[in-house]
Amino acid sequence: MSRIVCKWIVLSTALLAPAASFAQVACTRDGLQAATNLYIEAQSKGDPSGMPLANGLAYIENMQVVDIKSSVIQKPLKIDFHRTLIDPATCQTFTEVIVTDKSHPYVIGTRLRINHDKIAEIESLVTQDGDWLFNVDNYYKWSPAEDWGVVPPGQRDSRDTLVAAANAYLDAFLEKKLDLVPWGYPCNRTEGGIRTGKGVPEDSCQVGVPSGVNIVARRFIVDETMGAVVAFCTFGVGGLPDTHIFRVEKGKLRFVHTLTHVPEGRQVGRGGQGRGRGPNNEK
């Protein structure tokens, strides 16, 4: 009982005075959740000064190093929904953030990496109007309604299983070996704001998978408790910055979310350098 009380006090103090006590819980699940809470608060206020940032912080947006002073985290955003994956094994988190503000909507995927008592990296995949199939109203309609809840301990897939499922899906984009992907049913894939499913048991994530697209530079954040894995990657070497977020149940894919940034002037649909077509054959 005393350990529970002590842990609660430490976490409460971390949220109120992060620089002083964050180190005590930094790479535990609770500590990483506390770091995420600080990020959400910072993004809501447009002020990261309350975050325990490392002196040599790496701040990255759409796979480009940028000055945090001119970044999206400096903009106060009204966050309508967020969902977080926590990876204690690598001391990282990933948070999907949805902002439906009509004046400037966003869907953002943010990775935090903690180094001892400091946030050493903040990497955001920032999507907005003009990015791949972007439609925040649709994304907001579907994402919060999906079940990404905690998987019971006896039913959790291993880290290797989760990463293997993600890799099999991403590998299929090159040679279209769809039989090697652990498809689950029903499964729904959301790309930007387009969805494959129709709300029936036969819904499939297999619809509209392209070929000839080499998805490279993959980096994974894995949450076994949630049965989820996210891949930061690009469509071809130097291609479009992307995240794929997967929910896996009993080794099978159930949900896939895709955020893809299209740099100004970049065309899509050109094999390895492009994005192929959307799930319902959109360009």
Tell where the protein language model's regions lie, with residue ranges.
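Bacterial N-terminal signal peptides that target proteins for export
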Residues: 1-10
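N-terminal signal peptide c-region/cleavage motif recognized by signal peptidases
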Residues: 18-20
